[in-house]
Amino acid sequence: MKDIVSQVKDIAQKICEEFHLELFDVKYYNKSGRWFLEIIIDNPYDYISTKDCENVSRKLEFELDKINIIPNKYYLTVSSPGLNRPLRNVKDFERFTGKKAKIKTRENTYIGYIKNVVDNIITFETDGKFIEFKFEEIKKANLEIDI
């Protein structure tokens, strides 16, 4: 299964690059006797549209059918990381400076705004206070919907 995921990642990465998109994640799993292949794509400059998902899905389906690396019948989905997307690296924090986020450390969970990122230090504003986190201190982070 790991080999399938790595092969699909390679193919999906090339397809995403053709459409000026980024590959965010690939998941291949069995749920209730059915196989699922989930491709999550991102656009570093804009939101992901249904057309983006459709383009990647059609091209990926065509390429996967040609090489036939997946032995089981599967359901293919292509989607965006979503509104509550995970923040997985310093680059994500830089990209989403000014946005509302949730940061979990070993000690606490904070909800606030990403204010600045310099040398792997994230400055975060929560309840009118500024807190600095080393990226390594963050156990989990994601964007939050700002209403």
Swiss-Prot record:
Report the SS bond pairs: none
Q: Can you name a GO cellular component term?
A: cytosol
- The answer to keyword Cytoplasm applying to this record is yes
Q: Which SUPFAM superfamilies match?
A: YhbC-like, C-terminal domain, YhbC-like, N-terminal domain
Q: Please provide the record's keywords in A-Z order.
A: Cytoplasm, Ribosome biogenesis
- Which InterPro entries does the annotation name? Ribosome_maturation_RimP (IPR003728), RimP_C (IPR028998), RimP_C_sf (IPR036847), RimP_N (IPR028989), RimP_N_sf (IPR035956)
User: Major place of localization?
Assistant: cytoplasm
Q: Has the keyword Transferase been applied to this entry?
A: no
Stretch forming the signal peptide: none
What GO biological process terms are annotated to this protein in UniProt? ribosomal small subunit assembly; translation
**Subcellular location(s) of the protein:** Cytoplasm
Highest taxon of the lineage: Bacteria
| General function of this protein | Required for maturation of 30S ribosomal subunits.
List, alphabetically, the PANTHER family matched.
RIBOSOME MATURATION FACTOR RIMP (PTHR33867:SF1)
Q: State the family it belongs to.
A: Belongs to the RimP family.
Protein name as it appears in the record: Ribosome maturation factor RimP
- What gene name is given for the protein in this entry? rimP
